[in-house]
């Protein structure tokens, strides 16, 4: 239990926050935009915290890059963009969506946010409203895009009431907005020493492989479905 509690205590740490836009895995933003359009690739973007950013690892070892490997192995015409940002709370994520992300090309958006709100004991209703606003912004600005919501779990030492409110916010948001839902990003990784860095806190390369595996189980059918729909379109 305490290992799980500790695993939440560092989500807000990692690379310094940057105002630079994320670069697609595998090259510069300009190069990847060019190659994507040339090859008729579609974009799946990962909006997230240090868990998506890949704290303590090279970007190619973070789970979004592992997802790209799975996409390539499956021969699917999709490109991953890792838009993770360490230390980001849901309000800042919303601001990024409104000012930058909504202007980027993407067909599927994976949303992972809220962990850093939880670390500071931020009001759950406020966090939930921010996530809802992210969903609303994407639906209004990119109505054809598919949103996948990633759930998070609160540290038990925050108290039963807070834990219940926080943990319940994500499945409820997914249900109310009819979104594809991944219940817990760190399933099978949180608190497992062999899957975390030497500090016993952050997922290591093996941990990110596990994360990529269970994210892929949800993401793959979405990409195949949307790829088929695109191919069938006149």
Task: Outline where the language-model segments fall.
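Alpha-helical cap/lid subdomain in secreted, periplasmic
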Residues: 94-234
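Bacterial signal peptide processing site
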Residues: 13-17
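Sec-dependent bacterial lipoprotein signal peptides
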Residues: 1-11
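Conserved Rossmann-like nucleotide-binding pocket used by diverse enzymes
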Residues: 9, 79-81, 148
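Short, flexible loop segments at the rims of nucleotide/cofactor-binding pockets, characterized by
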Residues: 85-89, 158-160
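Short polybasic/polar patches that bind polyanions
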Residues: 9, 72, 175
């Amino acid at each position: 239990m305490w290992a799980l509690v500790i695993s939440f205590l560092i989500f807000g740490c990692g690379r310094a926050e940057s105002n630079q836009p994320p670069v697609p895995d595998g090259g510069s933003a300009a190069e990847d935009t060019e190659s994507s359009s040339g090859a008729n690739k579609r974009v799946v973007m990962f909006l997230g915290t240090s868990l998506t950013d890949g704290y303590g690892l090279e970007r190619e070892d973070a789970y979004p890059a592992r997802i790209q490997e799975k996409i390539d192995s499956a021969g699917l015409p999709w490109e991953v963009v890792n838009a993770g940002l360490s230390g980001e709370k849901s309000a800042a994520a919303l601001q990024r969506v409104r000012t930058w992300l909504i202007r980027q090309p993407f067909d599927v958006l994976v949303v992972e946010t809220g962990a850093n709100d939880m670390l500071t004991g931020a009001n759950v209703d406020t966090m939930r409203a921010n996530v809802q606003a992210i969903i609303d912004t994407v639906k209004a600005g990119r109505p054809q895009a598919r949103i996948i919501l990633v759930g998070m779990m609160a540290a038990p030492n925050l108290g039963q009431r807070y834990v219940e409110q926080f943990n319940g916010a994500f499945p409820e948001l997914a249900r109310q907005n009819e979104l594809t839902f991944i219940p817990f990003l760190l399933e099978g990784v949180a608190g497992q020493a062999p899957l975390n860095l030497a500090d016993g806190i952050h997922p290591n390369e093996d941990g990110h492989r596990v994360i990529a595996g269970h994210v892929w189980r949800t993401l793959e059918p979405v990409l195949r479905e949307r790829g088929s729909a695109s191919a069938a379109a006149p």
